[in-house]
């Protein structure tokens, strides 16, 4: 998988998962992020990152390239998703602030010294974004590595071009 293909794949995944996030927020705006809901959301995402590694292994025997493909796809996916989540929080702040998983954020806001919940929420989301991008890229690298290894181990590697 070329870098351009990885970026495009990440953009598509970011758009798909962002739409899923927005639809879920519209259908059940106060739903908690339960372990089952998180698995249902992130499981397919991680599988797609593994596919990036698998596709990369079809072009090269270097397993590091599979991890790089997974990491790049994950980074771009999460850049898009993070931007959409921040926009969603801003557009739906009144309802989002009532979510059970926001109660800790609301307690921290009250003692933060910020005069605006919107400003505080943006501060929290923007300062947390680099760590989330790092974690997503690391998980993407691992998924890409696993996808590449599975392809190589089961002989699915076919040179392209």
Sequence positions of predicted segments:
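Alpha-helical transmembrane segments of multi-pass membrane proteins, especially transporters
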Residues: 6-13, 65-74, 136
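Cytoplasmic membrane-interface segments at the C-terminal ends of transmembrane helices
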Residues: 50-66, 148-161
């Amino acid at each position: 998988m070329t870098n351009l293909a990885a970026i495009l794949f990440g953009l598509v995944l970011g758009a798909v998962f962002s739409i899923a996030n927005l639809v879920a927020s519209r259908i059940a705006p106060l739903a908690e992020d339960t372990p089952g809901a998180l698995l249902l959301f992130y499981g397919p995402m991680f599988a797609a990152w593994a596919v990036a590694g698998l596709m990369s292994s079809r072009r090269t025997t270097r397993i590091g390239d599979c991890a790089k493909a997974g990491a790049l796809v994950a980074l771009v996916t999460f850049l898009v998703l993070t931007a959409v989540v921040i926009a969603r929080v801003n557009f739906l702040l009144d309802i989002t602030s009532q979510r059970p998983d926001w109660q800790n954020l609301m307690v921290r806001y009250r003692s933060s010294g910020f005069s605006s919940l919107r400003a505080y929420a943006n501060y929290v989301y923007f300062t947390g974004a680099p760590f989330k991008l790092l974690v997503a890229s690391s998980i993407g690298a691992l998924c890409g590595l696993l996808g590449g290894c599975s392809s190589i181990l089961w002989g699915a590697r076919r040179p392209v071009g």
